[in-house]
Amino acid sequence: MKIFALHGLPTSPRLWERIQLPEGWTIDAPTCPGLGLDGTSEDWSLDYCVEQLQERANRADILVGHDMGGVIVAMMAKPGQRVVLSGTSLGAVYWAGIRMTALPLAHRFFYAKYAGKRFLRQGGLPEHADDLVDAFGDHGPGWGDRMRRIAKGMRPPNDLIERLDGCDLHLAWGRSDPWYPARIYQQLSRKTGAQLHLLDAGHFAPWEDPVGFEKALRA
């Protein structure tokens, strides 16, 4: 069984490192295009990511997407594929709010000041806070400004939920996720008919509860 898994940080591959897969299963967990050491261009976009990753996603039996990676995975999914989404939103209104954080005043608070550290420290269960910062907190120089460029480019298609029609859709969610709380996964489950798996985790469910996440992959 081949898994394609995508997060939305330069440290993306580490999100999946604690998951113990069944024998014979493999995982392809690339860094999201434009988030590597080569930097993030001012015109970075979700469509660019899809162009770079679609061929690899087509070879997978299971597509797994977390946060921004969930949006990109939903854009690439084909009918018949199993799709597992975690800690994300497919709604246009949510991402319109994220684009607002790229504006000058908001950018200084969200990105220039904290550079994602607050998102990490307050996103997981309290006992995981320090370990999450250690695992995911170093994104290289200029990360605050790169986050602004990414936020500006978060323009998913309006029919994102409809694109998952015909997929075997599962939601593997941290029950204590503060950034994508219950109303988001409940609405997504209701609109898509997805099977919901609630895990003992905050936002970073694949890393915080790898055993529960692995069970969701096999469900």
What do the predicted segments below correspond to?
Residues 201-214:
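Catalytic histidine-centered segment of alpha/beta-hydrolase-like enzymes
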Residues 112-164:
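Conserved alpha/beta-hydrolase catalytic His-Asp/Glu region
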Residues 149-187, 200:
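Conserved serine/cysteine hydrolase catalytic core
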Residues 4-8, 66, 173:
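The conserved beta1-alpha1 loop
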Residues 28-62:
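Active-site loop/oxyanion-hole signature of alpha/beta-hydrolase fold enzymes
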Residues 65-69, 73:
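Gly/Ala-rich beta-loop-alpha elbow adjacent to hydrolase catalytic centers
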Residues 82-110:
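Flexible "cap/lid" loop of the alpha/beta hydrolase fold
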Residues 1-39:
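Conserved HGGG/HGGXW glycine-rich cap/lid loop of the alpha/beta-hydrolase fold
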